[in-house]
Amino acid sequence: MDSPFTTKVTILHQGHIGDIIAFIPIYRKLNATRILVTDAAWGEPMTGYKYDSLKPLLDSQGIPSDLNQFTSSIDYDTTNWRECYKDHISLMDSQARYLHVVDRKTGHMEITEPWLKVEPNESLRGRVVINRSARYRNDKFPWSKVVEHYGKDAVFIGTDHEYNDFVQSFGQIPRHLTKDCLEVARAIAASKLYVGNQSSAYWIAAGLRIPLLQEVYEHAPNSIIRYPGAVYCFDGNIDFESLPK
């Protein structure tokens, strides 16, 4: 039970799963104690399966959350954070700039360690975890070569549509079913490499600081966190020798 003397700091967040995972280092920097997730006026609402998927991951990180629970005690409101959105900066920096956590024009969040910690799913230890969502694709990215190179170790996570689209386009690989973002995180945490495009699964991989290879959408490279082992492919050229074997 919280002490009555504990300072409570409540965040109102209007964004999607990836936006919220990218926001976690900002949440901690603000010493926040609760996040209230609300449906945005744009895009698919968080109400339903999206919030239901995200909540177990937030719970596992010690982040209390509620959905569409409005209150007068909001300390930080991110509703208009996209005022600071730019295609060429990360979703994390856009949100940090909006809340003046960093300079509003040029600020950058320095991330030097993982911001997510989960128990790895040991059944996937040493596998290459792949996800490809419908948005933010780059036709130059050599997915067929990735499947050829890592096929025996590869496993796909994602929706039925994402999986069917992937295997029809690039060849058969097995699928690992996940029911929520926490299970996605546990799968990625056990992997030797994560490969995917700009999606919530990417933000989980970056939060875990797992070696990764990203299919970068050249027109909006808004999901890049630099760290050793993170490779961002803009032009379709991949040096497989530099990646985990």
Residue ranges and their predicted role:
Residues 1-245:
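Catalytic machinery of carbohydrate-active enzymes
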